[in-house]
Amino acid sequence: MNDYNVTGTTLGDAFAKLPPNWGQLTGALLFLAACTWIYLPAFDGVPAPFAGYRSPLEPAIVAKTRYAFAASDIISEGYAKWKSSMYKISRHGGDVVVLSRKYIDELQNAPHERLSSIKGLIKNFGGQYSGIDLLDESDIGTRALQTKITPNLTKFSDDMRDELEYALGRDMPDCEDWTLVPLQPILLKLLGRITSRVLIGLPICRDEKWLDAASQHAHNVTITQIVMKAVHPIFRPFLNLVLPTVWRYKSAVRRGKAILAPEVQRRRNLEDNDPDYVKPNDLLQAMMDLSTPGGKDSQPEDLAHRHLLITLVAGHSTAAAGSHALMDLVSRPQLLEELRDEVLQVLQENGGNWGKQSLSKLWKMDSFFRESQRQNPPSLLGFHRIVQDPAGITLHDGVHVPYGTHLCIAPHSVSSDPAVIPNPDVFDGLRYYEQRRQKPDESMKHQHATADKNHLHFGYGTWSCPGRFLASDELKMTLSALLLRYDFKYPDGSSRPTNKHIDEFPYVDPETPLLMRRRHQGGTGV
């Protein structure tokens, strides 16, 4: 058989013309490339020191592996040394430049074309291997939350309360006596149902096949991005083929599309043919209305996939926040009773009715959630941005940041700094309640869902978390119902577990149990 011919030269001829030692040269180059990856941190042109290295001669791969298990210490070390400037961190998921918050004003509202929040999220969440890169093609999900959902949260209060009642009746275990219950799976179900009621509405929000697809998608995407970030990019295409969590999240996407895509088409048919048709009030409809007619983001399967991604971000992060908060509260029985009394008082003042206005009166609970988030953030790093300007950007102090650089800020370090927050090591559940009482004209600044320079866990500026107001309302409504209906305590000899970390992400064992018992006094109220 003849060798394959390219432009008149056979492969055999081409190989014959190579230097006799080409194999050794190729091997040497590959060895050099491997050594460079193992020993040297990436060079990005930013004049900043690295945190996390034990010595100048330490291989980069060692520092990257250390970060996977000691991110909290490394980020804290960098902040302590360089909080007024910037520092770098070597990670398997890509090196980052951690900025001082003094730069935040000049960066917060930079246009997407120069500094991309979406690309920062995508890179930090597994990129193309988690499916989340779809968000870079259109921002209709973010715009739908910002313009259609958040301004109209009062209209969702009755639906949210109705779904919470349904969830409590369906998903809560029988706890007539003290019963050991895994906390996070329960909260995932309760909050997942409320979120789905707002995002997709009846009847699909109660379709167990949809709920399972959304849950499996979120769970497996999360694990996939952790695994992908832990290995060198050269191995990721192979892992993408063999990793079981990739198979599972892609299966969940297919199942989710099979449910939502026909729903999109059904709504469009009704809108075109039924003059009496009233559009549903949910996120899916908002995304449909904002999509580009005839564009990719208007296609039913594209809308379905985007919806799954928003459900992922909204559901799991809110449930994790709820788990941390309830564990913090059970550790402080006096504060628990104080919050329970506040709920009863607000309900009494509102004739037993529950709505957005009632939630806004829960100042103590709002403060408690903000304090719990301060000590148990969703991530130790935030405000992720990728420099998109081909010429790079130049900061106000003359530091030049080249194209492609991954920037971020360390919100937990900021809110743990005694120069920023008095007594930051003390958990003070009423910290922000007292600040609102003492300075009523600054009340908004200290609310749970407010993003400011001292509390950057929801981001800052134009690209702050668009679902934070919905999440805050869901958490307050759910905790209120649980406090009025159940007593909680830790098993004998147990206490609030300490947080663990994978990279910069804090977590507790999702199966952490609490003892629960149904209350038969005080009414339900919610």
From Swiss-Prot:
Residues binding heme: C465
Pfam families per record: p450
Enzyme superclass (EC): oxidoreductase
Cofactor(s) it depends on: heme
GO biological process, one term: secondary metabolic process
InterPro entries membership: Cyt_P450, Cyt_P450_E_grp-I, Cyt_P450_sf
Gene Ontology annotations for the cellular component aspect, listed alphabetically: membrane
Membrane-crossing segments per the record: 21-43
Subcellular location: Membrane
Family: Belongs to the cytochrome P450 family.
Function: Cytochrome P450 monooxygeanse; part of the gene cluster that mediates the biosynthesis of terpendoles, indole-diterpene (IDT) mycotoxins including terpendole I, terpendole K, terpendole C, as well as the kinesin Eg5 inhibitor terpendole E. Terpendoles biosynthesis begins with the synthesis of geranylgeranyl diphosphate (GGPP) by a yet unidentified GGPP synthase.
Identification of the protein by name: Cytochrome P450 monooxygeanse terK
Gene source species: Tolypocladium album
Name of encoding gene: terK
